[in-house]
């Protein structure tokens, strides 16, 4: 069994790690709700609610592929490795797949997760997905960093000319698993375990505010592709 760990890659199309997981066997997916970590990063309530709404859409898409989406809660990313290990042990996971994220806390989170899983003979596959090139991989002939942007740009363009990144399709539907997907909370307060609310004394006004944000920022891959067209 393979496990895909969704983070900021809440999509099924052109998802490198999800594609890798599905190509190696039956796959389940997991998402970690970490309210205290989000607050440390000063993520706004409207941003967290966007994630919540996108997860609902994603869960429906995954259901069409027979990939159950599990929701787990922990306060911060320091708790993520243990939480993921428990999921892996519960479902006899052979390898966890995720797409690389490059923030300071993100890199420490992933390193700790890799270390813990490897101690239990569970693989950790971190894929290049959000960038065209792995950070630090564009170097001079003397293996140094470029000091002139024009030269750096030419090397990047040459590499893209030689081989453009492949656009990956959504995974094909797999055989149905005897694993139930977790429900996703229908409001921000419950989703964040009380960590986020609109802080509005007038709840009617608060509901109008969140509805307005949802209208201006619709979720779903179809809307995103339409805006990019």
Please place each PLM-identified region on the residue numbering:
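Trp/Phe/Arg-rich N-terminal binding region typifying the photolyase-homology
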Residues: 1-164, 168
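Glycine/tryptophan-enriched, flexible segments
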Residues: 145, 150-229
